[in-house]
Amino acid sequence: MLVQEQRERVVEELQSATYLGRSKHCNCGIYTFDGGRLPNLMHEVWRLRDLSYGEVGVALDDSARRCASDCDGSCRQLIVWDGAAEQIVGGYRYALGSNTDPQHLSIWRYYSLSSRFINDYLPSAVELGRSFVSPEYKCGGEHHRMYALDALWEGLGRVVVESDVRYLFGRVTLYPSLGVRARNLVVGFMRYLFPQREELVSARVPLRVGLSRYRCRKLFVGETIMENYRILMSLMRRMRRVVPPIISSYMRLSPTMQTFDAYANGDLGDVAEAAILLTVDDFYDGVKRRYLSQ
């Protein structure tokens, strides 16, 4: 919880952030800012991000908690702001490929990028980095969590439209609390239902998942993506696990999402992460109406 003096500094700095407008789905403002220029806002994002990771059992070290790229101009912070409560609802870190050297992207440390990806995709792409929903908006139940995520996606939609973005790429994160079997099942599902069509990126140290395409074909026998997603949820329930919400969020955007290698991220307590790529033109019509219409 912010003390009054800290809150006042955050509110004051918010006036210098770039205002993208109000959410159509909740009474919150959407802003972006450069973390190096607005230190109090950046520290509040760090604080909330740290709390969010802590809730799922991930203890960030100092370098991960205070990531240098947050302040070096290579990326920007997207936040949803609850003006009535004077606090941040959630946030996303992002970097426009047209403005960023590939070696300054957060994905660079973990993946080799092909020349085709760098030349043909990156100039029209946005990299999605770490995201979070503030604890106060998680404890309000699934409704509060979903409207927070919805507002964040609305903000990303505005970035996509204003910057003429054609591709989204980033990583989905699977936390250790999921367990190895459930983690492998989720990664196998994604790589089977949303396979890579080109070798655009490859993990520097790939994670061995141990779930073959043949095995996935035997498990996921539905005729549609959603039928197979329900099969995944049923299999996860048998293990007393749930599918991470971010998986559902991404797969509901487009049927042509591509999933690449997974790897173990030691910087985040050995969480597993898998790279994904989405083509904006392939978004479902409902997604375009909800998030890309002005």
Name every feature range the model reports, one short phrase each.
Residues 1-26:
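Short acidic N-proximal helix/loop "leader" segments that mark the beginning
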Residues 50, 60, 97-257:
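Acyl-donor binding region in acyl/amide transferases
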Residues 243-246, 264-269:
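Short glycine/proline-centered loop/turn elements that form peptide/ligand docking sites
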Residues 69-79, 257-258, 268-274, 286:
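A short helix-loop-beta-strand connector motif used in the catalytic cores of GNAT acetyltransferases and
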Residues 80-81, 275-294:
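Long, continuous compositionally biased terminal/linker segments
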Residues 56, 63, 255-265:
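Short, well-structured beta-strand/strand-turn elements
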Residues 40, 144, 284-288:
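Short, conserved charged micro-motifs
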Residues 21-96:
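Short amphipathic alpha-helix that is part of the acyltransferase structural core
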